[in-house]
Structures are given as structure tokens and as C-alpha cells.
């Protein structure tokens, strides 16, 4: 600033300070005014943007903090571009106004497609969504699916950060109407549990199909209805076999609050997150004509019109036409992944409890406990991808890792069979079809998987899955897993190719059953874990 007579130079250093933070909306071309020189009006509320900015008025300017703030803004997926401008204030030397130039992206979406699932068969799907409803970053979506065996309508609402809450508490709620064929009552190779039009249990060891001839009826046909057959032969148990696949119609909703454990600092990285919520639904077992069907029987168990009484299954709790399920759910998660989409290191832990409360005689009381732990270990084994062989001075781009996942769960209390744990499928033990390995009151799974890049958008995987029901299929109401000869435990090894797509990884896999030549192909969306 000045030089003393002795030749000493005095310098006055002023630390940059943020006087204010302003939001300015821009067009895709970067203009802040339209063709009539009017300012561009954005859809997003200013506070949705500024709440992600940790630098406040009066704070010293910090480039690292600003970079983290901009990264958080991009993480909302509401903006396609963000331009930062520092505007000096001549009357306040050293002070600047932080101007955020925001280019909004389209947040309304309409999509559709075709697919296949075991519970719905071939289905069509239409989805409507707005991820920035009223400019408040609210997400409202409607998903309608209609297939061969049923359909689903689901209306969801999400507020990722409740206004004014320093803990970043979020809210999610949904209402749904669905009709699906549950895999609990299905088997790939051993038949299915089919609907009974009517059933009367008079305590006999066997039940007899109506409308057939029997020795005790002098080889005359017994009446074709259960009521009439029961009147003529009251000491026998009777059933009227219909033979439809069992479907469940569900109407209900749920809501939950989630919160990272950040100590009230919304900008603090918090690996722990907690959830508390409530659910309610009416579940009604039906046939394909939407008639109530609370009873079913494994078709393979019927011999000459006779079946053991114990092999007739109550589809619902208390053999009721419908069940009301009311539950409270609490969960905690820990996430230290280095990459949210394709991690190569870090761990993920989750534990939850869901308590169902009986509100009438046809409403069960039970609890479901679940937990899982996943760990990734980075490796550098295969170098097929060119990013695994960088030239001198280049950074390696070779995400490969060993992933280990352990999952377990147990149900305590009187649980309806459709709430049992299923083993088998693309997100379980991959050598079996969905729910084709076990239907139990407890389960355990472990997966060991090696992931590695191949070329371009293709990656490979080699895996081994193992799972068990801990011999609990016999404890499920009606024992549907045992009636359908489901194995209960098994090991599956396999390999697959993963394709990166705009909607996420697409898995094409082949897996075997218990090291035999019995294998299945699998198509899945997203990594298994």
C-alpha cells in the first residue's frame, strides 16, 4: 500500500467476503432475459436453491465449500447447468455478491413400456411424473401397470427436504391398488396352489371333491355344491375345486419420515439415516373373476377327487375373505460407499422392524425383522478394459471389486402366508425362479460377487449365492412351500454381463442350481446390491 523511507513495503490484504447470494435464472443459451428484455422467471423457488448453499452472507469466500455446494445442487437433478459469477462491490472493497446462474431442466416426464414378470405376466406400463411440483422440489408420480394376471396403480409423493428443517428430514407417502399373482403359491416345476370355490371342514382326515362318484355314495355322483354334499354326508369334508391361480387384491397406502443423523447441520455428511413410518392395507384373495377365494389346494395333491384336509390352505389370515394390515416400521441405514451407482469400496448396513397390529379378528399381529450388510473390496485383477491399462500420466479408469452381502430376516407371531419370506429370483438366489427356493418364517442369504469392466458400456460379473429358510417352511400357515416341494436351501453359481443404460445397469445372467446342469437365465434392472 505504501513504501516507508526505509524502503519497507506495506501491503494491506483484504479477505474476500460474501456480501449476499443471489439466484438468476438463465435460458439454455445462457441469457438472463427473454426477447423482450424481461428477466427469465424460473419455476424453482429461490429457497430450494439457496438452502443447498452453505456459504451465507457475511462468510469468507471459500472455493472448496462452493464446489461442494454446487455438487449438492446438481444432486437435486433439477438443473442442467449452474454458472457461478462473483460480482465485486466497489463501495465495499473485498466484498462480492455470489450470483448463481441456474438453467432448469425439464422435470415433467411421461414414459411407458412393455415387460414381463412372474406375478403379472406380460404387462404394459405408463408413468407420469413431476420431480419439481410447484417449484418446491416435490416429486409426484403416478404409475399404472396392466398385465395378463393383474395390474398396479401407484400414486407417490416425496418431499426430499421438508421446508425449514435443519436436519434435512424428508417425507414419502403412497397410495396403491394392485392385483397380482403371489409367487408364494406358485412353483416352476411342482404345480401351483389353486383356488377352491367353497370348502367345508367337518374334521375328517380327507376332503372330497363335489360332483364325483365315491364308494360311500353307492357310486352315484354326490351333489355339485358343498352345501348340498354336506347335507347328505355331514361326516365328510367337502371342497369345490375351481382351479384358478390365486391372486391378491391390495388397497392401501403408507408414509414415512426419513432423516440423516447430521446433528442439525444440513451440510454435514451423515452416513447414518433413520426412518419411521406407518402402513395400512386391505388384502383380499380372489380368483380371476374377482370373487373372494380364501381357500386353496395344491393341484398335485388331489388324487381321484380326494385330498388330505391338512393340504388345503388358508390363503388369508383366519381364512377370512379379507385381512386388514396395519403396521409401524422403523429402520436405520449406514452408507459409506465411495460411489452410489457402482461402488468399489465401503459398506452398507440396514436393519428394520415392522410391527403389524391387529385391529379386529381378521387382522393379524406379528413382527418382521430384517437386516443386511454389504462390503466392497477394491481389486485390480483383470485388465480387459482399456481404462485398466492407462498410458503414462493417465489416470486409471478400472472400477472392479469383490462384493460380499449377507441378509437375514425372521417373522414373529401369526403371519398370513402371503407375508412369508421368499427365497429365489433375480435379487435373491439367482439359480431359482422368484420364490421358488423357499417360503419361510426366517431366511438367510449370502452372496459373493466379482465385478469388472469389459469394453465400452459392458461389464462382467461372476457370483455365488447361497440361501436357507432355516427349516421354517413348516412354520408358515398352510405350509405352501412344502406343499410345492420347494427345496428350502440351495447354492447358485453363475456369471453375467452388465450393460450401462440411461435407466441404470441392465443385467443378463445365467445361474445354476446346486452345481448341477439345471440352470436359468435372468434379466434384471440394476445391480443385485
Short names for language-model regions:
Residues 7, 12-53, 108:
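Sec-exported N-terminal periplasmic low-complexity segments
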Amino acid at each position: 500500500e505504501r513504501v516507508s523511507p526505509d524502503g519497507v513495503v506495506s501491503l494491506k490484504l483484504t479477505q474476500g467476503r460474501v456480501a449476499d447470494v443471489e439466484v438468476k435464472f438463465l435460458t439454455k443459451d445462457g441469457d438472463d432475459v427473454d426477447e423482450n428484455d424481461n428477466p427469465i422467471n424460473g419455476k424453482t423457488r429461490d429457497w430450494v436453491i439457496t438452502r443447498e448453499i452453505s456459504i451465507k452472507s457475511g462468510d469468507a469466500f471459500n472455493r472448496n465449500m462452493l464446489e461442494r455446494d454446487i455438487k449438492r445442487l446438481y444432486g437435486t437433478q433439477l438443473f442442467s447447468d449452474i454458472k457461478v459469477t462473483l460480482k465485486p462491490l466497489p463501495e465495499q472493497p473485498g466484498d462480492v455478491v455470489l450470483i448463481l446462474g441456474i438453467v432448469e431442466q425439464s422435470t415433467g416426464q411421461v414414459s411407458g413400456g412393455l415387460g414381463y414378470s412372474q406375478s403379472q405376466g406380460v404387462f404394459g406400463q405408463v408413468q407420469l411424473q413431476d420431480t419439481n411440483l410447484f417449484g418446491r422440489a416435490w416429486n409426484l408420480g403416478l404409475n399404472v401397470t396392466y398385465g395378463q394376471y393383474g395390474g398396479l396403480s401407484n400414486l407417490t409423493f416425496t418431499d426430499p427436504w421438508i421446508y425449514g428443517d435443519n436436519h434435512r428430514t424428508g417425507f414419502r407417502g403412497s397410495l396403491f391398488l394392485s392385483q397380482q399373482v403371489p409367487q408364494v403359491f406358485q412353483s416352476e416345476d411342482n404345480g401351483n396352489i389353486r383356488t377352491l370355490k367353497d370348502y367345508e371342514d367337518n374334521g375328517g382326515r380327507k376332503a372330497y371333491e363335489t360332483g364325483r362318484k365315491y364308494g360311500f355314495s353307492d357310486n352315484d355322483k354326490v351333489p355339485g355344491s358343498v352345501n348340498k354334499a354336506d347335507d347328505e354326508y355331514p361326516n365328510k369334508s367337502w371342497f369345490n375345486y375351481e382351479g384358478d391361480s390365486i391372486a391378491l387384491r391390495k388397497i392401501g397406502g403408507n408414509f414415512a419420515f426419513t432423516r440423516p443423523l447430521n446433528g442439525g447441520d444440513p451440510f454435514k455428511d451423515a452416513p447414518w439415516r433413520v426412518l419411521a413410518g406407518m402402513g395400512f392395507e386391505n388384502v383380499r384373495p380372489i380368483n380371476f373373476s374377482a370373487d373372494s377365494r380364501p381357500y386353496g389346494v395344491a393341484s398335485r395333491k388331489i388324487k381321484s377327487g380326494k385330498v388330505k384336509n391338512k393340504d388345503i390352505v388358508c390363503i388369508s389370515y383366519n381364512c377370512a375373505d379379507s385381512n386388514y394390515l396395519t403396521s409401524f416400521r422403523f429402520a436405520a441405514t449406514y452408507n459409506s460407499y465411495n460411489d452410489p451407482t457402482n461402488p468399489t469400496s465401503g459398506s452398507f448396513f440396514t436393519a428394520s422392524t415392522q410391527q403389524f397390529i391387529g385391529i379386529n379378528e381378521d387382522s393379524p399381529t406379528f413382527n418382521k425383522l430384517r437386516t443386511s450388510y454389504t462390503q466392497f473390496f477394491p481389486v485390480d485383477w483383470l485388465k480387459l478394459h482399456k481404462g485398466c491399462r492407462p498410458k503414462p500420466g493417465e489416470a486409471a479408469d478400472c472400477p472392479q471389486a469383490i462384493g460380499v452381502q449377507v441378509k437375514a430376516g425372521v417373522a414373529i407371531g401369526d403371519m398370513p402366508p402371503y407375508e412369508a419370506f421368499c427365497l429365489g429370483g433375480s435379487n435373491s438366489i439367482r439359480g431359482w425362479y422368484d420364490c421358488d427356493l423357499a417360503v419361510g418364517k426366517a431366511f438367510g442369504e449370502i452372496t459373493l460377487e466379482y465385478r469388472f469392466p469389459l469394453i465400452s458400456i459392458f461389464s462382467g460379473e461372476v457370483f455365488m449365492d447361497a440361501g436357507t429358510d432355516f427349516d421354517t417352511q413348516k412354520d408358515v400357515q398352510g405350509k405352501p412351500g412344502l406343499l410345492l416341494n420347494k427345496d428350502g436351501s440351495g447354492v447358485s453359481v453363475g456369471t453375467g454381463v452388465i450393460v450401462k443404460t440411461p435407466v441404470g445397469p441392465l443385467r443378463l445372467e445365467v445361474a445354476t442350481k446346486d452345481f448341477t446342469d439345471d440352470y436359468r437365465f435372468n434379466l434384471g434392472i440394476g445391480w443385485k446390491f
